[in-house]
Design a protein with these regions (language model features):
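Hinge/lid segment of periplasmic solute-binding proteins
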Residues: 38-39, 43, 116-180, 327-339
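Short, solvent-exposed loop/beta-turn-alpha elements that line the ligand-binding surface or hinge
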Residues: 132-156, 199, 224, 249-269, ...
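Extracytoplasmic/periplasmic solute-binding protein
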Residues: 163-176, 181, 205-260, 303
């Protein structure tokens, strides 16, 4: 269970059982184990190495090309290192596969991870490599003098992001990318319904406008767009939605020690409210309906909450839109922070 202050928003590269590290991968049921890894005095360029890297790419061909080009450039600098890339479309699948492979000692050398996943990996014996000594090594660490590329120094890494890669006083990952959530809005639809997009969205406003947008005419078509499809409000991550709502209500979700607090009266009230809007057709989620951007861009959605990392998919002029140009509708896009209770 993720503590809500993590909010699944930051990603990092974790070094899981690096090449040359001892790899006794039996589960320890709650104990925090460290891999027996020591920084070598020098890098042996005569020895061949293979590194397995598990990454996420959202089925984005441009992102895939960046991964491949980066690996190609890296292998040109280090011809004795081969990087084997495996791409996933879901962070949870990487997490599950790492856990599954701990028992068979087939974890990747490097993987993209949420910081809170590392705590689970550490329950295995000698699975995750602590990076403190490697990061500080003057030759091969951050900004190291013997590196074949221009590496950032530790001082050049945003300290707040680096801190999220620390657990029990040790660094187990390096920051890789960062995003948050935003609400992408069809401003034309909001105004067509007689409303004005406020600077700060509230849940009451979202629900009221969404219910208005869900109304159908006598011909059983949606009044707002004259079509057969309209999902006024779509939230990409229901995990994040619940975390946001409970945090805003100062209600329990979980503690840093893993204590579950989500089963409370506030959660019950929130879920009943959401269920009402699902029944009326005013609300849906990615897992039920698909990507919010596809509906927003086609004029079939008013409010779409998604990651800022996906901004290039949102709106009629989105360069990475997954729908055809013929299906896109022209409208003014407004962007706001996620809805608030106050």
């Amino acid at each position: 269970m993720r503590p809500f202050w993590k909010k699944m928003l930051s990603c990092a590269i974790a070094f899981v059982c690096l090449t040359g590290a001892a790899a006794g991968l039996t589960g320890c049921h709650g104990s925090k184990e460290k891999a027996a890894f020591e920084v070598p005095e020098s890098f042996d360029t005569t020895k061949q190495y293979e590194i397995t890297f598990w990454a996420k790419n959202d089925t984005n061909i441009r992102q895939t090309d960046i991964y491949k080009k980066t690996i190609e450039d890296f292998e040109a600098l280090y011809p004795n290192i081969t990087v084997n890339l495996k791409l996933y479309t879901d962070y949870g699948k990487i997490y599950n596969d790492v856990i599954t492979n701990i028992a068979t000692q087939t974890t990747p050398n490097v993987c993209i991870t949420y910081p809170d996943h590392i705590a689970t990996y550490l329950t295995g014996s000698q699975v995750v490599v602590p990076l403190d000594e490697l990061m500080a090594d003057p030759a091969y660490g951050l900004g190291g003098s013997n590196l074949e590329f221009d590496s950032p120094t530790q001082e050049e890494v945003i300290p707040q992001f680096l801190k999220e890669c620390s657990l029990n006083g040790h660094y187990y990952a390096l920051p890789y990318m960062r995003s948050t959530e935003a609400c992408y809005i069809n401003q034309d639809y909001v105004e067509q319904l007689g409303y004005t997009v406020p600077d700060v969205l509230t849940w009451d406003f979202i629900w009221e406008v969404s219910e208005a947008a869900a109304k159908k005419g006598a011909d059983v078509k949606y009044v707002l767009n004259g079509g057969d499809v309209m999902i006024p409000f779509i939230y990409k991550s229901t995990d994040n939605m619940m975390i946001q709502m409970l945090r805003q209500k100062n209600a329990g979700y979980s503690t840093q020690s893993g204590e579950v607090e989500i089963f409370n009266d506030t959660t019950k009230d929130i879920l009943f409210t959401i269920a009402d809007h699902v029944r009326s057709g005013a609300f849906s989620t990615f897992k039920i309906s698909s990507y919010p951007a596809n509906f927003l861009n086609a004029g079939q959605c008013v409010f779409a909450v998604d990651s800022t990392a996906g901004a290039t998919w949102m709106g009629p002029d989105a360069p990475l839109s997954d729908i055809s140009d013929e299906a896109k509708q022209s409208f003014e896009v407004a962007v706001r922070p996620v809805p608030q209770y106050d």
